[in-house]
């Protein structure tokens, strides 16, 4: 049976604001009607991410008003969720009020654990791994979600306050690299993820899945370097060896301008891809991941599947 009314899933993240309009289908993946993305950078307002960037708030409100109009054109039910940047911001109430008043959207601020649960559902919608114990990793701008699952049940769900924008703000402000900063970032990440790494290794997994923009972009860059450029990220494999080689190249390019000619690098990620590559490489080492399978599904798809 088909649910005749589409869902407009809106994800207000630390780096970008996304829209997915899709029609849920019983027993199958949702039918995607349209998608939109606006690179807002809400989480760049302060070093500690306790304040939202004022200009980014205005950009977000404008994007959300446009998303509402798109959703209404599809007669879709709007489900909007906000994650790390809004979750932690001391001024989140004023931002949410602006969104409600100016874009006419009520936003739910979800916990890190709920974010992980929805990401897990969305990832499994694209990578058929429910029959095996699996690990899901989602690197965002402000947080990283880790799930070990069996079927559609999460037996371990963690949300870590570490992401590519948070690390960039701390270690690589402006996107410029110093070699001692790279070493410091690696040491910090290694220590920060050690407790969850022990939990993951204790539970074990048969397949590792990665999702969202940072992992997708790294996988596309690695595929291009292998001589087999990918047309889609879904089910694309990223080996630890290929990731390590790519991360070495990225961290050797000291200025953001030095990275603009990296093939397949999203131009909106030139400054934050350094932190993203370091974080993913350290996660793969700590979890003993030899190969990561990329899922195009994540939070937004999980919101649709959860309705």
Locate predicted features.
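N-terminal basic/disordered segments at the start of proteins
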Residues: 3-31
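Helical "lid/coupling" subdomains associated with nucleotide-phosphate turnover
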Residues: 2-7, 21, 45-74, 83-133, ...
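Short aromatic-hydrophobic micro-motifs that form the base-stacking/packing surface
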Residues: 8-10, 79, 135-137
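Short flexible coil/turn linkers enriched for glycine and charged/polar residues
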Residues: 13-15, 77, 93, 140-142, ...
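A generic, well-ordered mixed alpha/beta core segment in the N-terminal half of proteins
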Residues: 135-143, 147
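N-terminal glycine-rich anion-binding loops that anchor highly charged ligand groups
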Residues: 28-42, 72
């Amino acid at each position: 049976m088909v649910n005749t009314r589409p869902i407009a899933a809106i994800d207000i993240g630390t780096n970008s604001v996304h829209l997915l309009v899709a029609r849920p289908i019983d027993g199958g993946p949702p039918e995607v009607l349209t998608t939109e993305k606006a690179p807002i950078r809400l989480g760049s307002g302060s070093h500690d991410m306790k304040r939202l960037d004022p200009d980014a708030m205005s950009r977000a409100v404008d994007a959300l008003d446009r998303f509402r109009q798109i959703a209404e054109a599809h007669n879709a039910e709007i489900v909007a969720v906000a994650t790390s940047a809004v979750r932690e911001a001391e001024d989140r109430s004023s931002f949410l009020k602006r969104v409600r008043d100016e874009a006419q959207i009520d936003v739910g601020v979800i916990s890190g654990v709920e974010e992980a649960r929805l990401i897990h559902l969305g990832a499994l919608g694209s990578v058929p791994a429910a029959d095996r114990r699996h690990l899901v990793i989602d690197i965002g701008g402000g947080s990283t979600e880790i799930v070990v699952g069996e079927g559609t049940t999460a037996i371990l769900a963690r949300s870590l306050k570490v992401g590519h924008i948070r690390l960039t703000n701390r270690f690589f402000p402006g996107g410029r690299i110093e070699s001692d900063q790279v070493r410091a970032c690696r040491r910090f990440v290694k220590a920060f993820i050690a407790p969850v790494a022990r939990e993951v290794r204790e539970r074990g997994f048969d397949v590792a899945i990665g999702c969202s923009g940072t992992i997708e972009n790294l996988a596309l860059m690695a595929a291009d370097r292998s001589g087999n450029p990918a047309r889609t990220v879904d089910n694309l494999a990223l080996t630890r060896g290929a990731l390590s080689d790519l991360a070495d190249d990225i961290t050797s390019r000291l200025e953001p301008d030095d990275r603009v000619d990296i093939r397949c690098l999203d131009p909106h990620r030139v400054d934050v891809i350094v932190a993203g590559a370091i974080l993913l490489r350290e996660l793969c080492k700590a979890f003993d991941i030899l190969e990561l399978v990329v899922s195009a599904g994540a939070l937004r798809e999980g919101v649709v599947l959860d309705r």
